[in-house]
UniProtKB/Swiss-Prot annotation:
DNA-binding residue intervals: 101-184
Cellular compartment(s): Nucleus; Cytoplasm
Gene3D superfamilies the UniProt entry points to: Transcription factor DP, Winged helix-like DNA-binding domain superfamily/Winged helix DNA-binding domain
Gene assigned in the entry: DPB
Gene Ontology CC: cytoplasm; DRM complex; nucleus
Alphabetical list of InterPro entries matching this protein: E2F-DP_heterodim (IPR037241), E2F_WHTH_DNA-bd_dom (IPR003316), TF_DP_C_sf (IPR038168), Transc_factor_DP_C (IPR014889), Transcrpt_fac_DP (IPR015648), WH-like_DNA-bd_sf (IPR036388), WH_DNA-bd_sf (IPR036390)
Family annotation (PANTHER family): TRANSCRIPTION FACTOR DP
Region described as Disordered: 1-53, 71-102, 296-385
Biased composition range(s): Low complexity: 32-53, 336-349
Domain of life the protein comes from: Eukaryota
Tissue distribution of the protein: Ubiquitous.
Ranges of biased composition (kind: Polar residues): 22-31, 300-327, 355-364
Record's protein name: Transcription factor-like protein DPB
Motif mapping: DEF box: 150-184
Length: 385
């Protein structure tokens, strides 16, 4: 009787509060029903009523929390209990380890073995076999939900394993058909092939580096030649002739018999040295011999290279033999193709330096000394493959 009176008074108090504040949610009916249903549960009626009064007088958030903690029976209690059991079961599945003790790595190995043994297969075929192999039997007391969950887990892992193997190019997939390609292997022949490829690439890099350096030297030589010619013309010592670029220089012994045939269109030249050793040089070689490529071109406000070094290129008379001094001088036979007899000063030319008062005779002027080189023709601005 005391418990009932407490609940009725409390319900009456709640109804008055609800009339005064319509926006407040009423829990009188629900609490009344709960107090009656819980009168036969564990604990004394007085303690249960005190717990109910505490729930109602708290705030809304506390009310939800404490109502969920009540031991509720009946239809509502059954539905909430089933929901709680379901959530608990899901939590155990997510947190607990795999009953089969198989991870993605083990499944990947199994999938790899299956596909390798079959050669050609499908996803469903591999998944069905692994489900039959790893799924728990029905006589161990496993629920159908657990078996369905395990089957889905196995199929998902098979799908992930196939994607990994496909990314590694171990298997290939054409629509639904999966084909085995093979595991990657590295043999001694592969290592040797990689070494040879590396050596070939290094050689190509070295050749391109040497070619780039040669082009830079040729550019420096041409710039210095242009500055030297401009200085000569501006000083009023313009020479009467020169050698136009590009050209080829033929070098052989002084007493050798050389037969030269030139086509009418001046595009083809045939040399017959009669088994005499010879060397072919291009204009870049001559620029290097004249020291044009040693120094970078000077700025317009700086000193000209021709003021520092006297570049003199005088082809030796083929009728004269080599000098008998300690350092032998090479005789040069020159052949070049010119379309005009008189060249303008803007065109690249190798112009001999005019004689000054300090030079008494042309015999005192030493010819160009060139090192002994093999018989190779180096064309200017040759393309690099």
């Amino acid at each position: 009787m005391t418990t009932t009176g407490s609940n009725s008074n409390h319900n009456h108090h709640e109804s008055n509060n609800n009339n005064n504040n319509p926006s407040t949610r009423s829990w009188g009916t629900a609490v009344s029903g709960q107090s009656v249903s819980t009168s036969g549960s564990m604990g004394s009626p007085s303690s249960r009523s005190e717990q109910t009064i505490t729930v109602v007088t708290s705030t809304s958030d506390t009310t939800f929390q404490r109502l969920n903690n009540l031991d509720i029976q009946g239809d509502d209690a059954g539905s909430q209990g089933a929901s709680g059991v379901k959530k608990k079961k899901r939590g155990q599945r997510a947190a607990g380890p795999d009953k089969t003790g198989r991870g993605l790595r083990q499944f990947s190995m199994k999938v790899c073995e299956k596909v390798e043994s079959k050669g050609r297969t499908t996803y469903n075929e591999v998944a069905d076999e692994l489900v039959a192999e790893f799924a728990l039997p029905n006589n161990d007391g496993t629920s159908p939900d657990q078996q369905q969950y395990d089957e889905k887990n196995i199929r998902r892992r098979v799908y992930d394993a196939l994607n990994v193997l496909m990314a590694m190019d171990i298997i290939s997939k054409d629509k639904k058909e999966i084909q085995w390609r093979g595991l990657p292997r590295t043999s001694l022949s592969d290592i040797e092939e990689l070494k040879n490829e590396r050596l070939s690439l290094r050689n190509r890099i070295e050749k391109k580096t040497a070619y780039s350096q040669e082009l830079e030297e040729q550019y420096v030589g041409l710039q210095n030649l242009i500055q030297r010619n401009e200085h000569l013309y501006s000083s009023g010592n313009a020479p009467s002739g020169g050698v136009a670029l590009p050209f080829i220089l033929v070098q052989t012994r002084p007493h050798a018999t050389v037969e030269v045939e030139i086509s009418e269109d001046m595009q083809l030249v045939h040399f017959d040295f009669n088994s005499t050793p010879f060397e072919l040089h291009d204009d870049n070689f001559v620029l290097k011999t004249m020291k044009f490529c040693d120094q970078p071109p000077q700025q317009p406000n700086g000193r000209n290279n021709s003021q520092l070094v006297c570049h003199n290129f005088t082809p030796e008379n083929p009728n004269k033999g080599p000098s008998t001094g300690p350092t032998p001088q090479l005789d040069m036979y020159e052949t070049h193709l010119q379309s005009q007899q008189h060249q303008q000063h803007s065109q690249l030319q190798i112009i001999p330096m005019p004689e000054t008062n300090n030079v008494t005779s042309s015999a005192d002027t030493a010819p160009v000394k060139s090192p002994s080189l093999p018989g190779i023709m180096n064309s200017s601005m040759k393309p690099e493959n």
